[in-house]
Amino acid sequence: MFNFSFSKKSIQRYVVGVAVLAASVSLTACSRYFSDGKAQNANKVVVLTPFPNATAEELAAAFTAETGIQVEQVLDSTTKILARLRIEKRNPRGDVWYSGGGCIPFMTAVKEDLLAPYIPKEHSQIPEKRGNLTMRDKSWRWLPLAIVSQGYCYNPQVTPYSEIPKTWDELALSKWKGQIEMWDPADSGTSMLFLAAAIQRYKKPNGDESVGWEYLTKVFHNLKRYTREGKPAFSVARGDTKIGLHFESQYLEFLDQQRSDDQLSHVQDNIAWYLPPESPVIADAIALIKDCPHPENGRRFIDFCLSSEGQKIINGYFFSIDPTLPPPKGLKEVTLDTLLERAQKLDLEWTAENYDRLRKQWQNTVEAANN
């Protein structure tokens, strides 16, 4: 059981070894997912996630090794997972959804009655709030999996730290025209959080969003392209673009894909991650899908992800909800205290209520008017 209070002291870095036994993990294509329905082996759990592949596979293998329950994973984008849950509302095929570029898509799913409540016995002390950070749904229909923050990658060989944009405002300056890359908000929870955070940053007390949309239009003009394959970090590391919008977990996964441990410093010569002041810092989430085919196995999978072993695996790329674990390896001086100090105060309820509207407005008033 974790103590969920955050220490204000700096968290010391250490390497956590995780032993994972061999286990059978089924990574299925969408066609198989849709054709199977509920007539499935009871000794399995169907998991939907956009999580980094390596971490998702490690979690699944460790869970199977501990419980004997097979994990069938559908790896897809947040937007597509949410759309799938809406389509399947009367006949869900998945049991658990975890990670969505933060908890906001889960809040949208709660409003649409797509998720089921679950209070884990070992973690019933998780508070609803920790300072400005929302830690769980008030009705326990989603739970915290990790803490994520949104910043951007840059290439120190191309753009020294002294020259990078130090605030989100600066991304709208004309000097960055053709130098920014991100995923399409139509598919990406990461990019949707960027839009929502920007609108809230500039929104006036009377609700006027015009300044925020002017800012986003300028950022759109500065985009080189949407990332269609891989991560924006690839283009940044190659020197094709100067700024790539990323959660720290996505940046750390990129590092891991490029090197072995003894090459970390060499890889970081070409890529670094920066967290500006007033950045989105939120809980990433895990939830049981309402009326899922394997609810008990789904609850056990959630229990495992919140356990010490599960959190040690997640800690490879993420800040754990267990404050005794160190920052993920590869972030240098960034600690949990850094995240909390630079966190933007977000109205997550407003964001969830306006999630689809913001995406459509981006498409209709920014993309369509400026292409």
Residue ranges of model-derived segments:
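Short, low-complexity disordered leader/linker segments with a strong preference
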Residues: 1-44, 370-371
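Early extracytoplasmic/lumenal segment of secretory-pathway proteins
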Residues: 30-107, 371
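Extracytoplasmic ligand-binding site segments that recognize negatively charged/polar headgroups
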Residues: 50-57, 80, 93-240, 254
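Short beta-strand->loop
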Residues: 115-125, 142-143, 169-172, 261-280, ...
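Periplasmic-binding protein-like
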Residues: 148, 178-187, 213-219, 223-227, 264-290, 304-327
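A bilobed periplasmic-binding-protein/Venus flytrap-type ligand-binding module shared by bacterial periplasmic
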Residues: 153-158, 196-200, 282-294, 313-317
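An extracytoplasmic/periplasmic, membrane-proximal ligand-sensing/linker region
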Residues: 320-371
